[in-house]
């Protein structure tokens, strides 16, 4: 996933890190990226990687809102035999971009269950709990300490969500 903030681009990857060197069809060996990559776009013709935040193995999704980067679905990894492995780290990670956009730092997070996608409105973060078939709402007014507000169940394959402009309706899409 890719998001921008100011003159910087943030790149997350869901590449399997069980084997960091992957042989491509071309016969070339590629080193898979780590964590969240930060690219300086001040001069787009000569964009350059300036930092790699290595606080996660991988991320399914990233979202920028109000100077913070939200890393979602992190540290889930699939082994070569298809078994899911988890490092038990944060399922929601909040990085401060405002203080130093070229070198974000973790300020908060939440561990509980895998989140597949999120949307944010008025300091409320709505997360899709795809495996628990739910939508989870968090108060993120204190980025250092997000608080679980509620969890709505019965939403099969909760894949993506979005809140209406007026904040009165939450839309959810299923992955099936």
Roles of regions detected by a PLM:
Residues 1-176:
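Feature marking well-ordered beta-strand scaffolds used for ligand recognition
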């Amino acid at each position: 996933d890719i998001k921008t903030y100011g003159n910087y681009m943030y790149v997350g990857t869901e590449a399997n890190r069980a084997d960091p060197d992957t042989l491509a069809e071309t016969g070339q060996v590629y080193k898979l990226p780590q964590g969240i990559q930060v690219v300086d776009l001040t001069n787009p013709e000569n964009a350059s990687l300036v930092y790699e935040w290595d606080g996660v193995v991988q991320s399914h999704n990233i979202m920028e809102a109000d100077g913070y980067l939200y890393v979602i679905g992190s540290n889930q990894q699939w082994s070569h035999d298809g078994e899911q492995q988890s490092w038990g780290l944060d399922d929601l990670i909040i990085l401060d971009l405002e203080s130093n956009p070229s070198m974000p730092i973790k300020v908060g997070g939440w561990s509980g269950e895998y989140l597949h996608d999120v949307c944010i409105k008025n300091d409320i973060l709505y997360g899709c709990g795809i495996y628990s078939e739910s939508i989870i709402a968090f108060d993120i007014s204190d980025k250092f300490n997000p608080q679980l507000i509620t969890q709505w169940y019965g939403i099969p394959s909760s894949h993506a969500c979005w809140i209406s402009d007026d904040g009165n309706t939450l839309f959810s899409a299923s992955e099936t």
